[in-house]
Amino acid sequence: NKKLPFWAGIVLAMKEEGISAPPISILDEDGQLTEATHKVLDIIAKYNMILTTGHISHEETFALVKAAAEEHNVKNIIITHVDFPTTYYTVEDQKKLADYGAHMEHCYTTYATKKVDYATTLEMIRAMGPEHVVVSTDLGQPTGLYPDEGMEAFATALYQDGFTAEQVRQMTVYNQRKLLGKD
């Protein structure tokens, strides 16, 4: 019996209260990005914001990232949870997305909660290279570690598994600064 993520408990409580939020898609019935999605991409590009993919489908991700990079000139893209079971991207998929300038996000909690084997996370990071990776924690829920503790644990694991201190800094600091327009 797996422990539910913190947010899943909220969704279940809302359902019990009769509150529902139907799923939405960024694609129309023809598989094209909706007009509303294009408007959001225009805003992201205009203000040099970061586009993240969240938990959307692979079909949506590839359509979104292609349009963001090619049609809207979005410069800062993160593919969220690339090694999470429901949003899992192969290294081949990640390389295609990186061709659009996207960074791949790996979260401490994904392997720490045994949703993926750490060796898989490590293999993906090595295949992509630190220049295409951002690491985060996905922590902050009231029942878990503090985010800084998770980041320290992830950085330490990467260092112990052969990444240099500079490579770890690239994945934990420099790539994020670049995405934020601070470099």
Kindly give the residue locations of the regions a language model identified.
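Short helix-capping segments at alpha-helix termini
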Residues: E70-K75, M128-G129, Q160-T164
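Divalent metal-coordination and catalytic microenvironments
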Residues: L51, M104, D138, V168, ...
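Histidine/acidic-residue-rich catalytic or RNA/ligand-binding cores of hydrolases
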Residues: F62-A67, Y88-Q94, K114-I125, T143-T156, ...
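Short acidic/histidine-rich active-site segments
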Residues: P130-P147
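Active-site gating loops and adjacent loop-to-helix segments of metal-dependent hydrolytic enzymes
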Residues: N1-T34, F154-A155
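Mid-to-C-terminal alpha-helical segments outside catalytic/metal-binding sites
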Residues: G150-E152, T156-D183
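Catalytic pocket-lining loop regions of alpha/beta-barrel enzymes
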Residues: D42, Y47-V116, V134
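A structural motif corresponding to the C-terminal end of an alpha-helix
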Residues: A36-M49, D161-A165
